[in-house]
């Protein structure tokens, strides 16, 4: 049933939000216990790849007990992510996509689980197109490489301060991505100082769309998101009055005098900070873990640090930073032998789809020399939504980190096993892994 058009809802109370989060989490556990593989994924079971195979074994597209259409088929997944009849929003709903005050026992909506108070993860198609037009000349697929030097300098400053033993996330990935983001955008010192802690607090944003965080985590996350927007609005205001180096001034110079709203530049900066940074941090950590587990691939990169981009691309396939993509049908869609009506929830299991033997040769192998067609993009960052918008900068940042590691820390080794963040079925976010440099 389509979502009715209505005014933006008032912020839910702690009681309302807590009840909603617990109810949806209960759905995951009940239907997971009954054997539904998608519900088991959302519960956070460790063997995520085996669960993806179970989903694929059920057919190209099947209905989960949670009321969601689910696929792990590589071909079907690629078509869904490229189909304009699927998007991040309910087709008849304006404003933030929230279901907190609904009776989910009746509506059966387990999408848009955690309200963010804004449309950061659910932009309308027109808004996405407008942001893409803004970002294209500055941080687009063909232009973002212009910021490689700025990103690289920031990464090397982080490496300069690393102790002999350090953590892949808190000491390497998060500071490197925060530093490179601040350098590329041209953020003031105040924002640079707050950025690492804000990135950590905003980390669960992508997961929270499908997996309920604990109530204190949800509140801290939305508070951090508001602070990020405040800092980016202040940075844009500064660049408006005193243009300077950095992507913020470059974005403000796009279509000068054309009536473009500076608020779009603020939103672009927020997207890069919240969505882009978490995606990049996860990609860096996943890449380091994959390389250190595959000595021959780490040796290839050490011998030729110029292959860092290849390492990033293979990580995006083999251990993607976004493993579940949530979509809503905007009209009737016929695919995979099924007819989906408008306003149906569809989830693509990206990690399983990108290991579909029908799509990739030797899909479980991590290899830097895997052939790719020109213009190819992995499913984790495909599409016109928030993930597609930040993809070029994510690639530049991650490439800068891996190249610097290969050049400066060739003796890098892992100490122990990695830990991943709880309630993170979408990102499967690395939490910690001790590393040592010889």
UniProtKB/Swiss-Prot annotation:
InterPro entries: Cyt_P450, Cyt_P450_B, Cyt_P450_sf, P450-rel_GT_act. Coiled coil: none annotated. Disulfide bonds: none annotated. Keywords: Antibiotic biosynthesis. It holds the Pfam family p450. NCBIfam families: P450_rel_GT_act. Belongs to the cytochrome P450 family. This is Anthracycline biosynthesis protein DnrQ. The lineage of its organism: Bacteria, Bacillati, Actinomycetota, Actinomycetes, Kitasatosporales. PANTHER family: CYTOCHROME P450 YJIB-RELATED, P450, PUTATIVE (EUROFUNG)-RELATED. GO terms for biological process: antibiotic biosynthetic process. One of its GO terms (molecular function) is oxidoreductase activity, acting on paired donors, with incorporation or reduction of molecular oxygen. Involved in the biosynthesis of the anthracyclines carminomycin and daunorubicin (daunomycin) which are aromatic polyketide antibiotics that exhibit high cytotoxicity and are widely applied in the chemotherapy of a variety of cancers. DnrQ is required for the glycosylation of epsilon-rhodomycinone by DnrS to yield rhodomycin D.
């Amino acid at each position: 049933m389509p979502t009715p058009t209505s005014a933006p809802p008032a912020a839910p109370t702690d009681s309302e939000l807590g009840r909603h989060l617990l109810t949806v989490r209960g759905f995951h556990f009940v239907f997971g216990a009954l054997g539904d593989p998608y519900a088991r994924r959302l519960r956070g079971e460790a063997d995520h790849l085996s669960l993806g195979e179970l989903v694929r074994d059920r057919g190209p597209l099947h209905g989960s007990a949670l009321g969601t259409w689910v696929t792990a088929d590589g071909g079907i997944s690629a078509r869904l992510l490229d189909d304009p009849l699927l998007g991040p929003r309910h087709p008849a709903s304006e404003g933030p996509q929230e279901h907190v005050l609904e009776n989910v026992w009746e509506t059966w909506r387990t999408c848009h689980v955690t309200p963010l108070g804004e449309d950061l993860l659910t932009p309308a198609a027109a808004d996405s197109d407008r942001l893409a037009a803004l970002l294209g000349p500055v941080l687009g697929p063909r232009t973002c490489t212009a910021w490689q030097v700025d990103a690289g300098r920031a990464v090397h400053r982080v490496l300069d301060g690393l102790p002999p033993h350090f953590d892949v996330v808190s000491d390497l990935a998060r500071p490197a991505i925060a530093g490179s983001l601040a350098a590329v955008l041209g953020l003031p010192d105040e924002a640079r100082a707050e950025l690492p802690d804000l990135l950590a607090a905003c980390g669960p944003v992508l997961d929270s769309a499908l997996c309920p965080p604990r109530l204190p985590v949800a509140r801290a996350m939305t508070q951090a998101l508001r602070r990020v927007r405040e800092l980016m609005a202040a940075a844009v205001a500064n660049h408006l009055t005193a243009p300077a180096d950095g992507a913020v001034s470059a974005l403000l110079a796009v279509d000068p005098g054309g009536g473009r709203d500076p608020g779009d530049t603020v939103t672009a900066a927020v997207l890069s900070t919240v969505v882009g940074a978490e995606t990049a941090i996860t990609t860096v950590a996943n890449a380091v873990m994959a390389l250190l587990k595959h000595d021959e691939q780490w040796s290839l990169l050490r011998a030729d640090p110029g292959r860092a981009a290849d390492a990033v691309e293979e990580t995006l396939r083999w251990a993607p930073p976004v493993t579940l993509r949530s979509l809503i049908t905007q009209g009737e869609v016929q695919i995979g032998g099924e007819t989906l009506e408008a306003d149906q929830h569809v989830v693509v299991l990206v990690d399983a789809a990108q290991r579909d033997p029908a799509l990739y040769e030797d899909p479980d192998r991590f290899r830097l020399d895997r052939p790719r067609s020109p213009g190819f993009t992995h499913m984790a960052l495909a599409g016109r939504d928030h993930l597609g918008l930040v993809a070029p900068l994510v690639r530049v940042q991650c490439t800068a980190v891996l190249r610097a590691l290969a050049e400066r820390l060739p003796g890098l080794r892992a100490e122990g096993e990695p830990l991943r963040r709880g309630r993170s079925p979408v990102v499967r976010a690395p939490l910690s892994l001790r590393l040592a440099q010889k």
